[in-house]
Amino acid sequence: MTVDEQVSNYYDMLLKRNAGEPEFHQAVAEVLESLKIVLEKDPHYADYGLIQRLCEPERQLIFRVPWVDDNGQVHVNRGFRVQFNSALGPYKGGLRFHPSVNLGIVKFLGFEQIFKNSLTGLPIGGGKGGSDFDPKGKSELEIMRFCQSFMTELHRHIGEYRDVPAGDIGVGGREIGYLFGHYRRLANQHESGVLTGKGLTWGGSLVRTEATGFGTVYFVQEMIKAEGETLEGKKVIVSGSGNVATYAIQKVQELGAVVVGFSDSSGWVSTPNGVDVAKLREIKEVRRARVSSYADEVEGAEYHTDGSIWDLTADIALPCATQNELDGDNARTLADNGCRFVAEGANMPSTPEAIDVFRERGVLFGPGKAANAGGVATSALEMQQNASRDSWSFEYTDERLHRIMKNIFKSCADTAKEYGHEKNYVVGANIAGFKKVADAMLAQGVI
């Protein structure tokens, strides 16, 4: 049986066993396509059911989360934790609180996390979790009660050497605080390393808040350097206006580029003169208002509800909002308008068709599992500080993050070249991330 037939047969089986999980199917299909190249060259990676084991979570947890609102009404949400692979270290990955969360989305995120964490070079496995709870419109006490109920079940499955969750969409510093506080009460110990994204006074790390956005920019900076260019003077589109987007905007402008647009779920803002990051942070983090407020208050900025942010002309695009936000038509428009570099700050924000268009049109593309690995890398640095009872300076932590992102780019670039797909960073990231995990799995036996 040829490698194509082996992979095709396995993927057909995976579709049947994981029906109704399109995001998970999409993530696996992309990786399997890259792995065909590895299996042709190194067939021993097909031994001992390795591919099947890699695509099957070690453990899937689904649990009810009952909580009481401010009016005394009981609500029941569903909680998830997918502990996907621990060959390299304890499961590591965020918690997402959003109405869209279901098992398929958590599995897709956990599967991507395996390769992302592997690429960091740090000893962490892959996992992901969350709930279909919506924090929007909830009071402080309602969010606290929900977090405490969620942790009442989750606490028995996590630990600094077992599984280390962090934040994600809907789970910020406030939620991490409530989750950690309840874990501490249930466990009767101050186990700092059990969660990352903590407050600075109780075990958190500097740069953690900025890490994903900064890291995405450090990655695209390496992509540009490899072409003999710099960020200076380049025009950049950044979708989103949350944590990742805000700090990507800050860092890319510090390095000399101009951000010409950003967005939220209500619309997008064109900013031909660049973005006032302090004003954006005040609007989104303090007032929690829509991006239309930015256009109302900053001269030269315009708010749009029609068209797409991807209609803007730019050299670089950084999708930092949510999965599948950038489709094939958007990709064609970007390429037509002269965009030459794309790096994903969000998880899987580009559709498979969009990625194909970028490849066909010669647009260099940095996949999320590599480009946005700065967040989990700095989470692992937080774990290191917790383990040594130490606290590092902002400058030192940022320098470590920058070095990790440079190494991730080099690993992707070198691996892509080794397997005959130079500058295809999707292939490079998938294969480089896979080989490290696969070697560990083969060494540890069939478990």
Swiss-Prot record:
Record: residues binding NADP(+): T212, N243
Q: Which reaction does it catalyse?
A: L-glutamate + NADP(+) + H2O = 2-oxoglutarate + NH4(+) + NADPH + H(+)
What are the site positions for Important for catalysis? D168
The Gene Ontology terms for molecular function here are: glutamate dehydrogenase (NADP+) activity
| CDD domains referenced in this protein's UniProt entry, alphabetically | NAD_bind_2_Glu_DH
Stored InterPro entries: Aminoacid_DH-like_N_sf, Glu/Leu/Phe/Val/Trp_DH, Glu/Leu/Phe/Val/Trp_DH_C, Glu/Leu/Phe/Val/Trp_DH_dimer, Glu/Leu/Phe/Val_DH_AS, Glu_DH, Glu_Leu_Phe_Val_DH, NAD(P)-bd_dom_sf
A single cellular component GO annotation = cytoplasm
Q: What does the UniProt function comment say about this protein?
A: Catalyzes the reversible oxidative deamination of glutamate to alpha-ketoglutarate and ammonia.
Q: Which family does it belong to?
A: Belongs to the Glu/Leu/Phe/Val dehydrogenases family.
Q: What is this protein called?
A: NADP-specific glutamate dehydrogenase
Organism in which the protein naturally occurs: Corynebacterium efficiens (strain DSM 44549 / YS-314 / AJ 12310 / JCM 11189 / NBRC 100395)
